[in-house]
Amino acid sequence: KKLRALSKGEKPFCLAVGFFKPHLPFTAPRKYWDLYDENAIPLSPVPNIPEGICRYALHNSGEFNGYLEGDERASLDKSVSEVYARKLRHAYFACISYIDAQVGKIIDELERLGEADNTIIVVWGDHGWHLGDQRVWGKHTLMETSLRSTLIMKVPHSSKSIENHRIVSSIDIYPTLMELCGVSVPDGLDGHSFTKLLADPKERS
């Protein structure tokens, strides 16, 4: 509804849409659970605590354990069972698929309105999440699993699909959008535009 109203205006628009999932608790409509065979879901490839690591870099999954409906409790001293780990990962995957479908609805509406080819789309997450990695179920660690987040951008008139592994930060999104929109970037920003990386992954932002 909001997109339809904005598309009728003569000025460029910016719409921010926030989705709560896949935040705890891991709940999603049944049809998204049914997309997966729980027995085929892989476990974490790095389930154990790295040797010699300072445990202050990790935690005992307090937020996760705070949800009383959980069947088991996670801790650094003992992993949850493989059966329960698969159940949890299944739930997380279902939440991701649910949100993926919601993002799809927005893109479908942009296409229906004829705005898709003139709209920059950013899918952005604020943190990663341990799914049993290093025995943690949650965020708030110093591990890459927690610190790395989702960032997907679709820029009009770009036919390339590029996967880029260079490091950027959330504070770089604003100056990037400003440059893409042809707007002067204010002085004194902490972030830097990474528009060059959108065209060539070998470039340095």
What residue spans do the PLM features occupy?
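Active-site-proximal cap/lid insertion segments
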Residues: K2-K11, A16-I167, L180-G188
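Short, intrinsically disordered, charge-balanced linker/junction segments flanking boundaries
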Residues: S193, L197-S205
